[in-house]
Amino acid sequence: MKLIKNGKVLQNGELQQADILIDGKVIKQIAPAIEPSNGIDIIDAKGHFVSPGFVDVHVHLREPGGEYKETIETGTKAAARGGFTTVCPMPNTRPVPDSVEHFEALQKLIDDNAQVRVLPYASITTRQLGKELVDFPALVKEGAFAFTDDGVGVQTASMMYEGMIEAAKVNKAIVAHCEDNSLIYGGAMHEGKRSKELGIPGIPNICESVQIARDVLLAEAAGCHYHVCHVSTKESVRVIRDAKRAGIHVTAEVTPHHLLLTEDDIPGNNAIYKMNPPLRSTEDREALLEGLLDGTIDCIATDHAPHARDEKAQPMEKAPFGIVGSETAFPLLYTHFVKNGDWTLQQLVDYLTIKPCETFNLEYGTLKENGYADLTIIDLDSEQEIKGEDFLSKADNTPFIGYKVYGNPILTMVEGEVKFEGDK
């Protein structure tokens, strides 16, 4: 058994003194003071905040096929360092988890290497080519969390509609990277004033919002839970808000980088600022914040997307899309939204715990007696600088290097086992 002493937990929106007794994988007791018994392993929280473990429904672990960028081991170590106890990896690997054989192989890699709980997606279509549906019932039987072709949009309405019908039959969500290929126009960043200034091809807002508009109507017809990945535009927020008001089962996520940065933050032709969807306008960012606060957007997910340094050293036109985010999400959001009074600590924690779990009907995301001992101890008071050399991820492709932040996790526990502690 383990006993966390001298911690603080959120109760009714306020930090309250609490000890947490852990028996095996579950929390046995939460109380203001618990006397330790002989032989118990005591963890001194030293007055720090003890949060439910965070749940990230959108990461890229790259394995199999892209191990030079990230592995399941390094990606989940990075997640633990960031306070995440559950992550859901996208299927844009090689091979794609699009069959029982491929999914079983992926699950074995997870079982052998993961440092946190991993709930893998299966693809919607074979090899994510958008031409042939996978075997939904067989993949659910193997443990598919949900279905997505993330990394690309499903281009034909008929294929998406048929996929939604199959997903509804097995009571799983269709999770969509929304991007109409005919509207990308070879873009490498947001189509706006900054792309014009830099002379870099831009991706217009409608590239995303048009496909969301199509899909919410398909989801309504199919009776399917439809989840929108990394919303980035004001038009997308409007479409999702209207769909929810119409009673369509649509949910959505937003990334930390789209909440924190805009096209105006891009200093030049620097691929560290290249992600998909791209950093949008100030108006778009404001719409995302409004949508998150009013419930149009359900939760925050990182879209952790590691790449090798030489890949991101290329010009924006040639470099791959994506930035890492597992190790920086909470500190950045806490520093920029909670410490300045825009959000409460409870709001931020909910966006990373209860909200994603409610979105996908998961049994995690809370600290409660008889619940899983998934938690992270966070130092809310000490300032640290984000340094790439401190990352446990293989990659450090993020524009947030050098930022000074508060709210750094100092210990993370998954099902009662310590998976990250300080610099270990």
Curated annotation (Swiss-Prot):
Cofactor binding, note field: Binds 2 Zn(2+) ions per subunit.
Organism: Staphylococcus aureus (strain MRSA252)
Annotated catalysed reactions: (S)-dihydroorotate + H2O = N-carbamoyl-L-aspartate + H(+)
SUPFAM superfamilies: Composite domain of metallo-dependent hydrolases, Metallo-dependent hydrolases
Binding site for Zn(2+) 2: 150, 177, 230
Function noted in UniProt: Catalyzes the reversible cyclization of carbamoyl aspartate to dihydroorotate.
GO BP field: 'de novo' UMP biosynthetic process; purine nucleobase catabolic process
Keywords: Hydrolase, Metal-binding, Pyrimidine biosynthesis, Zinc
Binding site for substrate: 60-62, 92, 276, 307, 321-322
EC number: 3.5.2.3
PROSITE patterns assigned: DIHYDROOROTASE_1, DIHYDROOROTASE_2
Lineage: Bacteria, Bacillati, Bacillota, Bacilli, Bacillales
Protein name per UniProt: Dihydroorotase
Record's GO cellular component terms: cytoplasm
Enzyme class (EC, first level): hydrolase
Family: Belongs to the metallo-dependent hydrolases superfamily. DHOase family. Class I DHOase subfamily.
Pfam families (UniProt xref): Amidohydro_1
Keyword Zinc: yes
Pathway entry: Pyrimidine metabolism; UMP biosynthesis via de novo pathway; (S)-dihydroorotate from bicarbonate: step 3/3
A GO molecular function held by the record: allantoinase activity
Residue numbers binding Zn(2+) 1: 58, 60, 150, 303
CDD domains cross-referenced by the UniProt entry: DHOase_IIa
Active site location: 303
Cofactor(s) demanded: Zn(2+)
